[in-house]
Every structure is written in structure tokens, then in C-alpha cells.
């Protein structure tokens, strides 16, 4: 089991990235916080050491994406009606970034993943291919298609 110092170090290093991945996938602050906690619990129980900081970062990205997918899969099987909650994140954003965020969040999951990892986490296509377990050319194709969709939906100043 990891020490408190290890946990503090990775929290300082990866917390923002993990939160952003959670929100991009789940689109809900409360669910994102639950998955965020699950990711760090998995880290605490993770026995293996990491080969490098890049390996550790990729591990956090992959585990977070998997945890979000598991969360969505679990709740998609449940019949429930969500409570009407004001989406705090959207209210806090200005109109321009809010419009961009809405369009990015509306992308299919595979495109959201590559856009996030490429532009926000600054991974290369080769690194994204490794994280997602896809071929490099697939990542390039998804990036191109995602950009085309964003250009079509945003138009105007974004084109």
C-alpha cells in the first residue's frame, strides 16, 4: 500500500487531469467526484511501481477513462430519474468557453477522448494510441474527424 506522501504527491500532480477527464466523460460534478475518489483508491491499492513519470501519468489517464466507462455502464443499467440540479460548471463558464465545452461534450466518446488527451494533456498521437490501445492511424483519423465535427458545429470564428 502507498504512503501518505505518495498520495499527496500524485494528488498534487494529477488531480486536475483526473478531474477534467471525469467531467469530460460524466458531464456531472457529483459523479465526477465519486469516480475521482475511486481512481485514487485504485492508486492506493496498486502494487506495481511505475517505470517513469510518463508511465504514471498514462496509468492515471487510462484508469480514469476506464473508471468513467464503468460508472456509465453501471448507471446505464439502472432505471432512475435524475434530480433537477443546476449544472454549476456550465453556469461558471463564460459564453464562449461554454459553447465550446458543450460542443466538445456532445462529441462521441472516442472523439472526446482523443481531443481531451491531445489538446488538454498534450499527449502525442503515438502516446494516445498507447493509452487507448488503438493504432496510431486510428488516433489521427479520430482527431481529424473530431476537428471536422467541431468546425461544422461551431462555424464562424472557430472555423
Question: What is the meaning of each model-derived region?
Answer:
Residues 1-20, 33, 44, 112:
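A short, charge-rich alpha-helical start-of-domain segment used by transcription regulators
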Residues 15, 19, 40, 108, ...:
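C-terminal flanking helix
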Residues 27, 38-55, 74-75:
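Sigma70-family region 2
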Residues 34-41, 54-66:
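Structural recognition of an alpha-helix C-terminal capping motif at a helix-to-coil junction
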Residues 51, 62-83:
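Arg/Lys-rich amphipathic alpha helix in sigma70-family domain 2
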Residues 65, 69, 132-157:
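DNA-recognition helix of helix-turn-helix
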Residues 78-105:
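Acidic, proline/glycine-rich intrinsically disordered inter-domain spacer in sigma factors
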Residues 114-118:
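A short pre-motif secondary-structure segment
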Amino acid at each position: 500500500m502507498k504512503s501518505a506522501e505518495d498520495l499527496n504527491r500524485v494528488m498534487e500532480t494529477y488531480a486536475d487531469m483526473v478531474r477534467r477527464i471525469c467531467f469530460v466523460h460524466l458531464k456531472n460534478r457529483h459523479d465526477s467526484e465519486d469516480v475521482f475518489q475511486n481512481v485514487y483508491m485504485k492508486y492506493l491499492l496498486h502494487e506495481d511501481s511505475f517505470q517513469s513519470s510518463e508511465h504514471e501519468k498514462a496509468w492515471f489517464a487510462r484508469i480514469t477513462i476506464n473508471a468513467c466507462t464503468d460508472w456509465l455502464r453501471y448507471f446505464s443499467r439502472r432505471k432512475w430519474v435524475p434530480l433537477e440540479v443546476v449544472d454549476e460548471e456550465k453556469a461558471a463558464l463564460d459564453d464562449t468557453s461554454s459553447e465550446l465545452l458543450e460542443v466538445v461534450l456532445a462529441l462521441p466518446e472516442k472523439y472526446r477522448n482523443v481531443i481531451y488527451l491531445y489538446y488538454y494533456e498534450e499527449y502525442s498521437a503515438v502516446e494516445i494510441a498507447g493509452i487507448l490501445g488503438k493504432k496510431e492511424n486510428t488516433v489521427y483519423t479520430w482527431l481529424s474527424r473530431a476537428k471536422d465535427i467541431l468546425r461544422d458545429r461551431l462555424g464562424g470564428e472557430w472555423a
